[in-house]
Amino acid sequence: VSAILKKGSSWYSSMGNDNAKGTKVWALSGNIKYNGLMEFDMSTTFHEVIEDVCGGISKKKELKVIHAGGVTGGFLPPSKADTPLDYESLLDAGVLMGQASFAAYDESACVIDLAKFSVGFNEAETCGKCTPCRIGLTLIKNKLDDISEGRGKLEDLDKLQSLCEEINVTALCGLGETAVKAVLTGIKYFRAEYERHIVDQICDAARCTGLYKYVVKEEDCVACGACIKPCPTGAITGGTRKVAAHIDMDLCINCNACYEACGFLAIV
């Protein structure tokens, strides 16, 4: 404010673009080297912020997804990284400025997992007054759970999109209208990832543990028994007295406890 008073409004309005003048403070997070609150010219692009200001994606990995607008925001692929950070450009890309925050993630992130978090947060925050938001978000969350746990079907994608569009136009407040952005943009830009979860039942980011099918590599198992005690359902037999462990997938709940307990990488 002091700089504007000193230099004048014309100086401040010289920054930005035709859609929006001046600057904006953004909250930056995700798999970037430097995060925090930073102020930018409104004409600055995602790419410029990530590479020139935040030091790029950490650990020399590649950008996979930009989550713009916070929990009520949406997802953008790397091809949209040249989008300026002004209101109209973000709307044209299918997302919102929202809380003026964005997170940049590498390939270790799963779009379905991120969408589940956003929808789950918004479901918990709904006041419950309108049916689209109160019931609709629960239905969407259940569908996302099905996809991430191996029960999804390809027709679920069209159902999800239709339900999200219905909530978007019938919810009574801004929360309900934007609560489904993560799902809509996820299906639009990352449909192949949704289909891989459904058809191949594989999460390349290894975030959806419900898709795991655990197998013990007998040649690597030393029968130490370390995997038996952490298992909450007693799904593991053997593993002692020189007998390799065996996992009963009918009892397994995909909690990942055995995988984390094995120090010999015998469980895959």
Question: Residue ranges of each PLM-predicted region?
Answer:
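Cys/His-rich zinc-coordinating "finger/knuckle" motifs
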Residues: 134-140, 180, 228-234, 238, ...
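Residue-level detector of family-conserved "landmark" positions at structurally sensitive sites
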Residues: 49, 60-61, 231, 241, ...
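Ferredoxin-like iron-sulfur electron-transfer modules
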Residues: 118-121, 202-223, 234-254, 265-268
